[in-house]
Structure formats: structure tokens, C-alpha cells
Amino acid sequence: MGRHASLVLNAQGDPQIAYYDAGQGDLKHAAWTGSAWLVQTVDSAGNVGSYLSQAADAQGASRIAYYDAGQGDLKYAAWTGSGWHIQTVDATGNIGVHASLALDELGRPRIAYTNAGSDELRYAWWTAVGWEIQVVRSGKNTAASSSLALDENGRARISFYDPAWRHLRLASIEPFGVYLPFLMGDPN
């Protein structure tokens, strides 16, 4: 219990921890109420909840991106105030490991993640009509361990490890496409 944990603070500064319960194969969420921990099962549809990333919206409600190993999908869960709303973001193969979640200025989710089979790096974002998905870096063994941040203009910056070359890379998602300006080689 407690693998792949991700911590955020709600609007009152209380901790909320999303984690993968390996014994049950479930995604769980623990929220401090001020006097006790409230633990909920977010998703229990098979082996779900590993490689997760959590963010809190402006009201402090949890949003979680995670891998569904049973189906091989990237999923997204949002606390609605009364329950968890779950969506499948990407179901195009064994996809969704190393998820990194950020929320834009309007609270819309953005997720960087990789394909478990090929280490292809992808970026997904929510629009008014659904999820949009962009391939950031393709090819066998090209990306792992992604981390996403949004700049002051809401543009995505994704750091990731390039296992083929043993390099740390930085991708910038620009209006014209993907820009890969930074490369730091392994000194060993």
C-alpha cells in the first residue's frame, strides 16, 4: 500500500495523498479532514493507479492522472465534491506510464506520459470537446520519466529521460509544434 504516492494540499492547506494500493490493485485517495484521514477508493477496475500524478484545482479539489495496467490505458479522475469522475484519456495501446499532470489557468488538465511498450512521449490536454493528444517524441526507447510544467503563457514544458542516448531532454510545446531545445548528456 502507498506505492506511486503523490501529495497536494487543498485550499485549507490540508494534505491529500493519491496512491496505488498494490495489494488490492486500486487507486486510492487519502484526505486529512482536520482530525482523521478519509480514505476513498478512486478506481478499482482491475490493476489501476500506478504511475500516477496528482494536482489540486483552485478550490483544492484533487485531479489524478494514472495508468490502468489492466487495460493498458491512461486515465484521469476528478473529484466533483460528491464523487470521482473518471475518464479514459488515451487507449491506443499499452499507454500511460510516467504520467505527469498540470492544470492550466482555467483548471483544465494537461498530461505528459509515455507508451509502456515503446517509451514514446505523448502530451494530452482537455478541450471543450474532449481530449487532444500529441506525440512529442516517437521511436523505440526515446522517452521515460516525464515531468510537466506550464509556463506563464500556459505552454507546456516537458522534461524527460532519453534512454537510448542516456540524456536528459526538455521539450517545449509551441503553437507550431514541438521544440526540443535542451539536451544534457550523461557525464558517465
Language-model-detected regions and their locations in the chain:
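Extracellular, repeat-based ectodomains that mediate carbohydrate processing or recognition
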Residues: 1-179
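Enriched but not universal
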Residues: 176-188
